[in-house]
Amino acid sequence: MLVVEYDFKTIKLNYCLVLLFFILIGCKSTNEVTTSPVKSVPIEELSSVDMKTWYQKDYQQDSIPGISLDKWYKQNNKKPKNKKIIVAVIDTQIDLKHEDLQGQIWTNLEEIANNGIDDDHNGYIDDINGWSFTGTKSGGYVVWNSFEYVRIVNNWGSLFKDKTEFQIDTQYLHKYRQYQRAVKRLEERNKYYRNWLKSLKYNIAVYPKVKDTLKYFFPKEDYTYHQLDSMYNKYKINSKTYKQRRDDNDQDLGALIDCMMANLEVNHKTLENIKDLEVQLDSVVNKSLNLIYNERLLIGDNPTILEIGYGNNNVSNTIKGVRTIQDHNTMVSGIIAANRTNEKGIKGILQNVKIMPLNISPSGDEHDKDITMAIRYAVDNGAKVINMSFGKEFSMHEDWVLEAFKYAEEHNVLLVRSAGNESLNVDKNESFPRDIPLGGLKEICGNFITIGSSTHKLDSTFVSDYSNYGKNNVDLFAPGGKIYTTSASNSYKSDSGTSLAAPMVSGTAALIWSYYPNLTVTEVKQIILESGTAYDIEVLVPGGEGKKVKFSELSKSGKVLNVYDAMELAKKVSKKKR
């Protein structure tokens, strides 16, 4: 499966020829749910209509391993006790004008719009619908962030460059090792992206000849990847690799087939697609990977301290000639809150919800400062759930973020994070933000859930091949493969990623609190984990080269989100507290 996110926050490309593009439950049990694990049963391929709503279905009723949302709505006849639950979505910018999000966006009623005054005295001027922590001094927005490992090399180089571990004081060893890892990663990524960019330039140069030549063999230009692949044997083409052809600037039939296969591998069917990706890769190389580039100069803050009020209030900014970055948040928010009653597009998890968009995620890695301040803003302004569909492999100021986690816990706020799309075991590989240190078992806080991605197929491919996993560091799985949701520019589309699995859980938590407001954050977390559906099947381990394990071994709960069972358990727990 190909997962392409053009903002380069998460890139998972099987680019084939071009080379390269989210135990026990750690808190006291609230109640026991005894459900027999579901065994694998072959199901028919879903229709295009069913694929748009598969994740809301129930396995027992529909033979589709969704989250049983439709089942709950069909049987529920009660009205929620809370009129509106606020869910903060810490992410990119958002399409505030999307038809399916009208009436679903949080409004700060204590603030008077556009008067240039901080009416509610929260430190943020004119924060009507949220805040952009990556908004610039000029009223614009940052499009390209540096990667965190670039920042580490930049900031810690004076301390550690050219030194051995024996020369480092023990109190700085952790930082030193992270610095060494960052240096290595920067070297690897520079090579990786420059090689990819070189390949794209080659593909662009030969593209007209590729189209003309293949039209001779396929007059209707209806060729598939596999048809092109079969031409190697049919026409006895030499066995040179793509890299060899590229470096030799070959333009024979083999080279032309190679280039088009590479384009089809990532669904780049037009020259415009390839040129757009070239522009983005050029920015990755010259901005995100550039030791000199500093996006914080555009914002005007001090990145070494925590402070209130930097950025701007425009969470849905569009500037002519500047790449927009609204798609990711719009997709995530639609899953949670798309209007269920307007007969348009899709139906979100719940109707009585308000999305609080908080921008921290341009292309590149999020800053720990922005993560921290966004969490605190969300808590201080009434959010009950915070969705964080982002992640990175380094963290300069993890202590800031963990303090924000605890601040949220003290205020009874749930944090939901996507596990990431690198096909990695995050029990053994660094992934931030997190609530359990690498190699540890104990949670730092009780209000944090990490979500992996599942598919609509209850077979060995049930776990999405891109999804990160971990018996200790991933709590639960939820549908994330081929999810049809809202998209930027008032549109809809299907996409995949753990980024789309996390809001399934965020929406469920909001739904629970809307009916059972007396529950604590630890109870809501426990309810969600305990009530999930267990599937007694063996699945392919993501990135495991064909290795299979029990599905239950890939997360702490060993389960998939089940809204119906979560609401039933929440009802029982809530009733006992009255």
Q: Can you say where each PLM-predicted feature lies in the sequence?
A:
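Extracellular S/T/G-rich loop segment that most often corresponds to the catalytic His/Ser-adjacent loop
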Residues: 300-304, 413, 434-514, 518, ...
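Short, low-complexity, disordered segments immediately C-terminal to signal peptides
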Residues: 31-42
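C-terminal motif of bacterial Sec signal peptides marking the signal peptidase cleavage site
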Residues: 24-26
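N-terminal secretory signal peptides that target proteins for export/translocation
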Residues: 1-11
